UniProtKB/Swiss-Prot annotation:
Residues 2-58, 186-194, 273-293, 640-656, 708-715 are cytoplasmic. The gene is PMT6. Residues 1-31 are annotated as: Disordered. It is found in: Endoplasmic reticulum membrane. InterPro entries: GlyclTrfase_39-like, Glyco_trans_39/83, MIR_dom_sf, MIR_motif, PMT_4TMC. Protein O-mannosyltransferase involved in O-glycosylation which is essential for cell wall rigidity. Transfers mannose from Dol-P-mannose to Ser or Thr residues on proteins. Residues 340-394, 409-467, 482-540 form the MIR domain. CDD domains: beta-trefoil_MIR_PMT2-like. Pathway: Protein modification; protein glycosylation. This is Dolichyl-phosphate-mannose--protein mannosyltransferase 6. It comes from Saccharomyces cerevisiae (strain ATCC 204508 / S288c) (Baker's yeast). Its EC number is 2.4.1.109. It catalyses: a di-trans,poly-cis-dolichyl beta-D-mannosyl phosphate + L-seryl-[protein] = 3-O-(alpha-D-mannosyl)-L-seryl-[protein] + a di-trans,poly-cis-dolichyl phosphate + H(+); a di-trans,poly-cis-dolichyl beta-D-mannosyl phosphate + L-threonyl-[protein] = 3-O-(alpha-D-mannosyl)-L-threonyl-[protein] + a di-trans,poly-cis-dolichyl phosphate + H(+). Glycans are attached at N156, N404, N481. Belongs to the glycosyltransferase 39 family.
Length: 759
C-alpha cells in the first residue's frame, strides 16, 4: 500500500511487474524543462496572434491606403468622363484654348496672356485626336464630325480626375484623421466646379492639378524633415521643383503656390540656421540644394517651355504684332515686305520700338484732350496705314525734297548724327515734342503730331543716333555701311534737337481717349543701353532705290524674344480691366466666390442645348468658408492658452498646427486676395485653387473640434458630413453633368435669387 501510494498510481494493478517496473524506473521530470515547454507554447500562441494581427493590419492598410483612394479615383474619372461629349458645341473658353492648341498644329505664331505649357498640352491632345487644325473653334459653333473633341476633352479631364488621389495623400501626409482624409478626398471628387471645368478644353484642371501636386510635394518634404539629404528627401525636393515649374508654365497663378513653398523653405532654413550643431558648410549646402531645385529647375522648365513654343510656331500668325521686327521677319510667310537696304531722305517707312513694348510708331487725327491739344502720337502693334512715316529734311536745314523724293536728283542716305524731320503720311503732321508733361507717365515730355509740310518749327527736328548694327548671314550684305541707317538690322535713337530728350515707349497705355494704345514720350535718357529709346525701321519703301529681294535678316535673340514675350503677356493681362460703360454678365467680384453669390453660364442657354453652370458645390463652398472664419479664432485660442501657460506645445505639435492649419490658410489667402485686390476683370473660375485650400482648412477645423469628442458623437458627425457632401452633389449634379430641356425643371436648384440656373 505504502509503495503504491508513494507512486501516486493507486488505481493501477500493482501485480503487473512489467508495468510497475516501467513506471518505477522512469526518471522524474525536471521543473525547469516543464517551464520551458510552457513558455515555448505561449510564445507560439503569441506569434500566431501577432501574425494574425499583422495580417489584419496589412489588409486594413491596403484597404485604407490603396483600395479606398483607388475607388475614389475611379469615381472621379467616371464623373468627369460622364457625358463628356453630350454638348457638341464649342463651350466657353474652348473658343480660346482650343484655337491656341490648333495654332501649334498649324505652326502659326499667336499671342496669349498665359505661358505656353498648358496650351501645348492641349495641342498634344489635338494631335492625339488626329486634328488637322482647320476647325477654328468659334464660340458656340458645333464641332464637325471629323474633329474628335471627345478625346481632347478626356485628355483634359484626366488632370481633373487625378486631383482626387493627390488630395487624398496630401491630407494623409498632413496627419489628418483618416475620416477627415477621406472626407477631403470625397469633397474634391464631388466638387461641381472641378467636375465641370474638367469636362472641357480649358487650363483650369491643369492649373489645379499642378497647384495641388506642388503643395503635396511640400507636405511630403515636411514629413521627411528629419531625413534631410537622404535620397528620398532629395527626390521629393526635385519633384517639388518640377511641379513648381509646371504650374508656373500653365498660368502665372502658379506663382501664388510658389510663394507658399518659398515661405516654408525660409522657415526650414531659419531653423537650420538656429541649429548650432549644424556645420556651416552643411548649412550652405542646404541653401545650394534648395536654390537648384526650387529656383533653377522651375526657371529652366519655364524657359524650356518657351523654347519649344518658339520652335513649334515658326510661321507668321495672329501674334506677330506683339513681337519685335527680327522675330517677325524670321517667321515663315512674314508680312514684312522686302525693301531697299539703305534708308534715305524721302523714304517711307514704319518704325518699331525695341523696348519692352515693341509697338509701331503711330498717329491719327484724334487729339490729346489735355496738354497741347495736338494730334496724338501712340504705339500700335498691328499693321495700319497710320503707322507710315516719311523722312524729311530738318526745318533748320532749309532743304526740301523735290517731286521725285530726291535733293536735286541726289539720293541722300540717313546717316549717324544727321538731323531729320518725320512727317506722318496720312495726317501730314510732324513728329513734335515740347515742354508739356506726358499724359500717363511722370517726368517725361509729350510727343505730338503738329503742323504740316509748310507749318512747323525747330521742335519738329530730331537727330539720328545709330547704336547698333546687326550683320546678315548672307555674305553679300554682311559688310553694310555701319554709318547708314538700314531697315531691320539697324537700331537707332531719335534725340530731340531742342529738348535733348529721346523718343521712347514707356510700356504704359493711354486711357480710352487714346484707344488703350501705347504711350509714346520724349524722355531724358543718360544711357545708350536704354532699350525703351531704341527703334528700328521695319517696312521700307523708296521707289528711287532697288529692293533687296535676296536679303537674309539676322536671327533674333532667344533671350530678347523670351523677355519681350513675357512683357507682352503682362501688358495684355493688365489690359483686361472691366469696362465701366458695359455690363458683363459673366464676370464677378471676389467676394461672390466664397459666399457662392453668383455662378456663370458656360454656354448658350437655349432649351435644345445641353447647358452647364459653373458654380462651386454649396456644401463644399459654404462649409469651407465658415471654416475660414473659425480658423483665426482657433489659432487665437491656442495662442491664448499657450500664453497663459495652460497649454504646452512640443515642437512636433507646433509643426502639426502649422502644416495642417496655418499653411492651408496662407495658401488660401495667396490664391484669393490677389484677385480681390487686382483691377483686372475676374470670373468664378479664379477661385478654383483657393477653394481647395479652403477645404484643407476645413479639415483642420474639423479635426481640432472633434479631437476629444466621444466616438458616439464623432462618428455620426462624420457620417452626416459624408452624407451631406454626397446628397448635395446628387442634387446639383445637373449643373456639371448637363441640363436638358425645360429650364423650369431646375427651379428647385435656384436657392439664391442671384443664381441664374433656371430662368
Amino acid at each position: 500500500m505504502s509503495k503504491a501510494k508513494g507512486t501516486g498510481f493507486s488505481s493501477i494493478d500493482t501485480e503487473d511487474e512489467n508495468l510497475r517496473e516501467r513506471y518505477v524506473n522512469q526518471p522524474k521530470a525536471n521543473a525547469s524543462d516543464i517551464q520551458d515547454e510552457q513558455l515555448d507554447c505561449f510564445e507560439q500562441l503569441e506569434e500566431k496572434h501577432r501574425t494574425k494581427k499583422n495580417e489584419e493590419y496589412t489588409a486594413l492598410k491596403i484597404l485604407r491606403d490603396v483600395i479606398g483612394p483607388l475607388l475614389l479615383t475611379i469615381t472621379s474619372f467616371y464623373l468627369r468622363f460622364q457625358h463628356i461629349d453630350q454638348n457638341n458645341y464649342v463651350v466657353w473658353d474652348e473658343a480660346h484654348f482650343g484655337k491656341f492648341g490648333s495654332y501649334y498644329i498649324k505652326h502659326e505664331y499667336y499671342h496669349d496672356v498665359h505661358p505656353p505649357l498648358g496650351k501645348m498640352l492641349i495641342a498634344l491632345s489635338e494631335w492625339m485626336a488626329g486634328f488637322d487644325g482647320q476647325f477654328d473653334f468659334s464660340s458656340n459653333n458645333a464641332y464637325p464630325e471629323n474633329v474628335n473633341f471627345k478625346l481632347m476633352r478626356q485628355f483634359n479631364a484626366t488632370f481633373g480626375a487625378l486631383c482626387t488621389p493627390v488630395a487624398f495623400f496630401t491630407a494623409k501626409w498632413m496627419g489628418f484623421n483618416y475620416f477627415t482624409v477621406y472626407l477631403i478626398a470625397t469633397m474634391v471628387t464631388l466638387e461641381h466646379s472641378y467636375i465641370v471645368l474638367s469636362k472641357f478644353i480649358l487650363l483650369d484642371s491643369m492649373l489645379l492639378f499642378f497647384s495641388m501636386t506642388t503643395f503635396a510635394c511640400m507636405i511630403k518634404l515636411y514629413t521627411l524633415r528629419k531625413q534631410q539629404m537622404t535620397k528620398k528627401w532629395s527626390l521629393w525636393m526635385l519633384l517639388t521643383g518640377l511641379s513648381i515649374g509646371c504650374v508656373c508654365s500653365v498660368k502665372w497663378v502658379g506663382l501664388f503656390i510658389t510663394v507658399v513653398v518659398g515661405l516654408y523653405t525660409c522657415i526650414e532654413l531659419f531653423l537650420l540656421y538656429c541649429d548650432k550643431e549644424l556645420p556651416r558648410i552643411k548649412y550652405y549646402k542646404h541653401w545650394l540644394i534648395r536654390i537648384i531645385n526650387l529656383i533653377v529647375i522651375p526657371f529652366l522648365i519655364y524657359l524650356y517651355c518657351f523654347k519649344i513654343h518658339f520652335v513649334l510656331l515658326y510661321k507668321s500668325g495672329t501674334g506677330d504684332s506683339t513681337t519685335n521686327t527680327l522675330f517677325q521677319i524670321n517667321l515663315e510667310g512674314t508680312q514684312i515686305e522686302a525693301g531697299p537696304r539703305d534708308v534715305a531722305f524721302g523714304s517711307e517707312l514704319t518704325i518699331r520700338s525695341h523696348g519692352l513694348s515693341p509697338n509701331l510708331l503711330h498717329s491719327h487725327i484724334q487729339v490729346y484732350p489735355e496738354g497741347s491739344g495736338q494730334r496724338q502720337i501712340t504705339g500700335y502693334g498691328f499693321a495700319d496705314s497710320n503707322n507710315v512715316w516719311k523722312f524729311e529734311f530738318s526745318r533748320s536745314s532749309g532743304l526740301e525734297l523735290d517731286q521725285n523724293g530726291t535733293l536735286n536728283g541726289k539720293i541722300i542716305p540717313i546717316t549717324d548724327g544727321v538731323e531729320v524731320r518725320l512727317s506722318h503720311k496720312n495726317t501730314g503732321s510732324n513728329l513734335h515734342s515740347h515742354d508739356v508733361p506726358s499724359h500717363v507717365s511722370r517726368g517725361n515730355y509729350e510727343v505730338s503730331g503738329y503742323g504740316s509740310q509748310s507749318v512747323g518749327d525747330e521742335k519738329d527736328d530730331w537727330i539720328v543716333e545709330i547704336v547698333k548694327q546687326m550683320d546678315s548671314p548672307n555674305p553679300v550684305y554682311s559688310n553694310e555701311n555701319s554709318t547708314i541707317l538700314h531697315p531691320v538690322s539697324t537700331f537707332f535713337r531719335l534725340r530731340h534737337k531742342v529738348l535733348g530728350c529721346y523718343l521712347a515707349s514707356t510700356g504704359l497705355t493711354y486711357p480710352a481717349w487714346g484707344f488703350k494704345q501705347a504711350e509714346i514720350v520724349c524722355k531724358d535718357s543718360w544711357s545708350r543701353r536704354d532699350k525703351s529709346t531704341w527703334w528700328n525701321v521695319e517696312d521700307h519703301w523708296n521707289h528711287n532705290l532697288e529692293t533687296a529681294e535676296d536679303y537674309v535678316p539676322p536671327k533674333s535673340n532667344f533671350w530678347t524674344d523670351f523677355i519681350l514675350t513675357n512683357f507682352a503677356m503682362a501688358s495684355s493681362n493688365n489690359a483686361l480691366v472691366p469696362d465701366e460703360d458695359k455690363y458683363d454678365s459673366l464676370s464677378s467680384d471676389a467676394w461672390e466666390w466664397p459666399t457662392l453669390h453668383k455662378g456663370l453660364r458656360m454656354c448658350s442657354w437655349a432649351g435644345y442645348i445641353t447647358r452647364y453652370y459653373l458654380m462651386g458645390s454649396p456644401f463644399n463652398t459654404w462649409i469651407s468658408t465658415v471654416s475660414l472664419i473659425i480658423f483665426p479664432f482657433i489659432i487665437l485660442f491656442i495662442l491664448y492658452r499657450w500664453r497663459r501657460q495652460t497649454l504646452y506645445l512640443s515642437d512636433d505639435q507646433i509643426w502639426q498646427i502649422t502644416i495642417q492649419g496655418i499653411f492651408p490658410f496662407i495658401s488660401w489667402m495667396t490664391h484669393y486676395l490677389p484677385f480681390a485686390m487686382m483691377g483686372r476683370v475676374t470670373y468664378v473660375h479664379h477661385y478654383v485653387p483657393a477653394l481647395y485650400f479652403a477645404m484643407l482648412v476645413f479639415g483642420f477645423v474639423l479635426d481640432f473640434t472633434l479631437t476629444r469628442v466621444h466616438w458616439m458623437v464623432k462618428y455620426p458627425i462624420y457620417l452626416s458630413l459624408f452624407g451631406g457632401c454626397i446628397y448635395i452633389y446628387n442634387l446639383f449634379a445637373p449643373i456639371c453633368q448637363g441640363m436638358h430641356g425645360d429650364k423650369a425643371e431646375y427651379l428647385p436648384l435656384q436657392w439664391l435669387s442671384t443664381w441664374d440656373i433656371a430662368p
